[in-house]
Swiss-Prot record:
Assigned protein family: Belongs to the universal ribosomal protein uL11 family.
Protein name from the UniProt record: Large ribosomal subunit protein uL11
Coiled coil feature spans: none
Species annotation: Corynebacterium kroppenstedtii (strain DSM 44385 / JCM 11950 / CIP 105744 / CCUG 35717)
Record Pfam families: Ribosomal_L11, Ribosomal_L11_N
Assembly description: Part of the ribosomal stalk of the 50S ribosomal subunit. Interacts with L10 and the large rRNA to form the base of the stalk. L10 forms an elongated spine to which L12 dimers bind in a sequential fashion forming a multimeric L10(L12)X complex.
GO cellular component labels: cytosolic large ribosomal subunit
GN (gene name): rplK
Assigned keywords, A-Z: Methylation, Ribonucleoprotein, Ribosomal protein, RNA-binding, rRNA-binding
InterPro entries noted in UniProt: Ribosomal_uL11, Ribosomal_uL11_bac-typ, Ribosomal_uL11_C, Ribosomal_uL11_C_sf, Ribosomal_uL11_CS, Ribosomal_uL11_N, Ribosomal_uL11_N_sf
GO process terms (BP): translation
Function in brief: Forms part of the ribosomal stalk which helps the ribosome interact with GTP-bound translation factors.
Keyword Lipoprotein: no
Keyword rRNA-binding: yes
C-alpha cells in the first residue's frame, strides 16, 4: 500500500453547480493553500454538471504536495426549502411573519435527497430535521406529524 499523503489544509466552500471559476471566493481560498485553481474548477464543474441551478457544498482536502481531493455534499436544506416554497429568501422574523409553506411530503422528499448528510436514523427523523429548518426560516409546514 502506498504511504499516506500528509494533509496540509481543509477547505469548505459552497459554489453554484457547474459554475466554479477562479474569481472570489474560489480563487483566494484555493490560492492560499497553493492548489492549482483551474484544475479544481474543471474537476468541480465536471462533477456537478448534472446539478446545475443548485448550490453544492464541497470539502477540499489539500495535501503537502499541493495535490487535492474533494468530496461533494448535498445542497443546503435551506436552499432546497426555498426552491420547494418558490421563495427568494426566508423570513426576517420567522416566529411572527410566515413567508410561505411546504407540505410534509415535500419535507420528506428533501430529507430523502439530504439523507447521506443528515444526522438521522430514518426518513421520518430526517423530515423532522428539515421541518425544523423550515420553521426557523419562517416557512410553515403543512400536514406535519410532529
Amino acid at each position: 500500500m502506498a504511504p499516506k499523503k500528509k494533509v496540509s489544509g481543509f477547505i469548505k466552500l459552497q459554489i453554484q453547480a457547474g459554475q466554479a471559476n477562479p474569481a472570489p471566493p474560489v480563487g483566494p481560498a484555493l490560492g492560499a493553500h497553493g492548489v492549482n485553481i483551474m484544475e479544481f474548477c474543471k474537476a468541480y464543474n465536471a462533477a456537478t454538471e448534472d446539478q446545475r441551478g443548485n448550490v453544492v457544498p464541497v470539502e477540499i482536502t489539500v495535501y503537502e504536495d499541493r495535490s487535492f481531493t474533494f468530496k461533494l455534499k448535498t445542497p443546503p436544506a435551506a436552499k432546497l426549502l426555498l426552491k420547494a416554497a418558490n421563495l427568494q429568501k426566508g423570513s426576517g422574523e420567522p416566529n411572527t411573519n410566515k413567508v410561505g409553506s411546504v407540505t410534509w411530503d415535500q419535507c420528506k422528499e428533501i430529507a430523502q435527497t439530504k439523507m447521506e448528510d443528515l444526522n438521522a436514523n430514518d426518513l421520518d427523523m430526517g423530515a423532522r430535521i428539515i421541518a425544523g429548518t423550515a420553521r426557523s426560516m419562517g416557512i410553515e409546514v403543512k400536514g406535519a406529524t410532529a
